[in-house]
Amino acid sequence: FPLLAIPFFMLAGNLMSSGGIAKRLVNFFDSLIGHVTGGLGMVTIIVCMFFAAISGSAVATVSAVGAFMIPEMVSHGYNKPFSAALTAAAGTIGVIIPPSIPFVIYGVVSGTSITDLFTAGFLPGIMMGIALMVVCYFVSKKNGYRGKEKASTPAEIWKTFKDAFWAILSPVIILGGIYSGFFTPTEAAVISVVYSFIIGVFVYKELDIKGAYQSFKDAIVVNGATTFMVGFSTVFAAFLTMAQIPNMIAQGILGLTGNAILILLIINIFLLIVGMFVDNIPATIILTPILLPICTGIGMHPVTFGIMLTMNLAIGFCSPPYGINLFVASSISKVSIEELTRKILKPLLALIVVLLLITYIPAFTMIFLNK
């Protein structure tokens, strides 16, 4: 039953992208901070954070926000490779800020409460956004990427807020309902689809039959591939368990050192490397039974491990050679992967700093949980 959330969150993200929600979020946040140094880059990051709270997908976030913001940043003098790299990095927040498709997968595999994972992922997602905004500010200051000539007036801010109100309300309804216990994450995914459809068709009036058809089609195609990955990965994970591979790997890691700090560092490095080559869904299904017992054995809570695992694999989305966010941003911006790779290094380092904070300071993930 929890896996049913995946296709519905995918569909909701597609409907919102086609329904003009991303554009209105951009206009609102641009009116707030578009005038500061690096303002457009920061707007891109914040909109990615909001869109993440709607779609639960990194690729959907990069596609929806990047198509609008990369050309906008370039038109205001931003370096195109940097604009694309920043968007690719910000897209990783899509699987950390709830709702999150990888959290659903991890919750099913590990038996961890999906609602707890959604609650715990909120603060780390915000931390990732802040870290990227700090990078954006200093890079913009160094290269002269200035904001708008003048700040928006209160009347202009109010106008963009009214236009974006229903878009802003969407994550409030979805996450508020989950956190309050009013509905489950799976039910929230269905409500998200209904809400997106109503807003796109009847409020913003930008979602037509063609757009709705394409949204359903894209969701079906992506979910089909996802379902196959889940099926085959589950079988492979069961085979590894029967062959006692998890026990062998655990003994190998624990044989290297008994120091909890070093064990977590080794696991993080391993997961970062895996994330560069393997999609997050099969990686989560295969590696959770192997690594979770090791981490819980040294005192880490399963929720914290789930955030750490997902964040590692998310960073892989924008890491060469096979980071999917890089390819999406490259396709949108027409910038080569080689150019993107050079510009992604600083955002990647910022995300890794947040990862280490999450790993070694459990309060960042457990602060909103009464556990």
Q: Which residue ranges define each predicted feature?
A:
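Alpha-helical transmembrane segments of multi-pass membrane transport proteins
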Residues: F1-K371
